[in-house]
């Protein structure tokens, strides 16, 4: 059966959307969505969405105090693990934490009452990747708020192999990407970003998708880099970005995740855009467009779109 949808999807006033398909076929969209935690939305077909309320909410004992951003959820050993960013009450610096739940609908509870790691700098946008050999990797952004390079504030991407607890690293994180391409420097010379990592494996190659430029600017866009190993070295595509503002009505498409269509025949990039394209801000909404790989291995996105699109639903 074919369904029709049109961007933006009915998930609004959010940022950094991540979509998970649960074993029962229900889709969960987690996002930056509340000042004190995270809400989720559910769907049976990726087209029709219903708000499910809070799935994680801070308490008086929580290590995170504010700025709850970019939740991602994975199913592992029968439980659901959420990695998220927040501002640490101890020092007001951004860190990444992990919470666990028995259901994708929560409630998620912090595994420990502290960030999952503290390397003395601000870190956000955690992403877990499971490789075919069973090894697990954690990607994140070293935030520009506390990373000054040659007088510029820069966000850099790192990776570390995870232990089985999904909480601790097997070794020191490795630097894998930093702003260097022309399109990544359009928000000005003093602040530059590589953030929002998401990794896919295709025909033995590792594709690191990421966003660059200021999130509340029209120039926020998605690029990617390729490697033969999950830890790099990653080489950025020469024709980046692959998702960017192409018409006045669409501003700042970025911070993506990827999900298969209900029938498994297509890959879909889920991302956010600014609600008001003429006044970009933290008020964003969810969009979704097809993506894929060319014969030469290069990645493409058919978007951003704002006209009706068809999607293949689960088989009858």
Regions found by a protein language model. Give the residues of each.
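Carbohydrate-active catalytic/glycan-binding domains of CAZyme proteins
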Residues: 1-316
């Amino acid at each position: 059966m074919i369904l029709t949808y049109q961007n933006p999807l009915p998930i609004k006033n959010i940022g950094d959307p991540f979509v998970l398909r649960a074993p029962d076929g229900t889709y969960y969209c987690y996002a930056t969505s509340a000042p004190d935690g995270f809400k989720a939305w559910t769907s049976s077909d990726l087209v029709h969405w219903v708000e499910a309320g809070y799935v994680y909410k801070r308490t008086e004992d929580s290590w995170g105090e504010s700025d709850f951003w970019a939740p991602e959820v994975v199913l592992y050993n029968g439980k659901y693990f959420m990695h998220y960013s927040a501002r640490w009450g101890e020092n007001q610096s951004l860190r990444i934490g992990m919470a666990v739940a028995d259901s994708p609908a929560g409630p998620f509870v912090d595994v420990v009452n502290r960030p999952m790691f503290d390397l003395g700098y601000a870190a956000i946008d955690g992403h877990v990747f499971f490789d075919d050999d069973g090894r697990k990797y954690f990607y994140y952004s070293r935030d520009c708020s506390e990373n000054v390079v040659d007088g510029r504030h820069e966000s850099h991407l790192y990776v570390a192999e995870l232990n089985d607890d999904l909480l601790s690293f097997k070794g020191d994180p490795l630097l894998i990407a930093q702003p260097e391409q022309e399109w990544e420097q359009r928000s000005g010379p003093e602040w530059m970003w590589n953030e929002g990592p998401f990794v896919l494996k295709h025909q033995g190659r590792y594709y690191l998708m990421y966003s660059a430029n200021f999130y509340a600017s029209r120039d926020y866009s998605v690029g990617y880099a390729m490697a033969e190993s999950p830890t790099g070295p990653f080489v950025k595509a020469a024709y980046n970005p692959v998702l960017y503002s192409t018409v006045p009505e669409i501003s700042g498409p970025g911070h993506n995740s990827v999900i298969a269509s209900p029938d498994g025949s297509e890959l879909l990039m889920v991302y956010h855009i600014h609600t008001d394209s003429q006044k970009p801000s933290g008020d964003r909404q969810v969009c979704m467009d097809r993506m894929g790989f060319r014969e030469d291995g290069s990645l493409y996105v058919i978007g951003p779109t704002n006209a009706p699109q068809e999607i293949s639903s689960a088989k009858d």
